[in-house]
A protein has these predicted regions:
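Hydrophobic N-terminal alpha-helices or hydrophobic patches in metabolic proteins across all domains
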Residues: 1-216
């Protein structure tokens, strides 16, 4: 099959058309969201007078979750105060001193990713009640992955502060977009469209049987 004919056949396939349309919605949602986020005061016109409270709440979740994981899995010595991690070690005189400080700020709250996921769900195909339920579940997944991200970055920062910025910008940040893409893919694959019902098999009793006498 020639390439143009293959492309035409692929596009004319109804399933491929749906997938292409939903993928375009993913791209449009991402572009529109980032344009609005960076060029408007999106946080204020979404949350109004509750903006600071909303960000404080989700930042506290990220900080508390990261702190719990640090206390459980990290081998570093640190002190926590006011959403900050103070990493300590003994100096030459044997006294404990802080050698690095990491603060969990509003940008670490994952609200941006949740809002992007919300816009994506609004534009995606599917029933609204299903999208509402999936948005709540997907937002929880984003929050949990963000806590894991905070923990990994905090532990990395305590071990090697000089490597932190690179991994923050080029590893940890893209991971959150991978999570959003995975949530979109699961939605499209399993929830966006109603599965076609299989044709009910005919009742065998209604079919003529070779064992029964047939009228001439």
């Amino acid at each position: 099959m020639k390439e143009p004919q293959f492309i035409k056949t692929t596009i004319e396939n109804p399933k491929n058309r749906k997938l292409l349309k939903d993928f375009l919605m993913l791209v449009v949602a991402s572009v529109v969201f980032h344009f609005l986020y960076w060029n408007t005061d999106m946080n204020s016109w979404l949350f109004g007078p509750f903006t600071d409270r909303v960000f404080d709440f989700f930042t506290l979740i990220a900080y508390t979750g990261g702190k719990m994981l640090m206390n459980t899995f990290s081998s570093l010595d640190f002190v926590c105060e006011n959403s900050s991690f103070y990493f300590i070690q003994p100096n030459e005189q044997g006294q404990l001193q802080c050698y690095a400080t990491m603060q969990i700020i509003h940008d670490c709250s994952a609200i941006k990713q949740i809002m992007q996921f919300l816009l994506l769900m609004v534009l995606c195909s599917g029933k609204w009640w299903k999208k509402a339920i999936y948005f709540v579940g997907g937002s929880l997944v984003i929050v949990l992955f963000n806590i894991l991200r905070i923990y990994l970055l905090t532990d990395l920062f305590g071990h090697n502060p000089l490597q932190f910025q690179y991994y923050h910008d080029w590893v940890a940040r893209p991971i959150m977009y991978v999570v959003i893409f995975a949530l979109w893919a699961v939605w499209i694959q399993f929830f966006a469209y109603s599965k076609p019902k299989d044709d009910c098999p005919q009742d065998k009793r209604s079919l003529p049987s070779s064992d029964l006498p047939m009228a001439d």
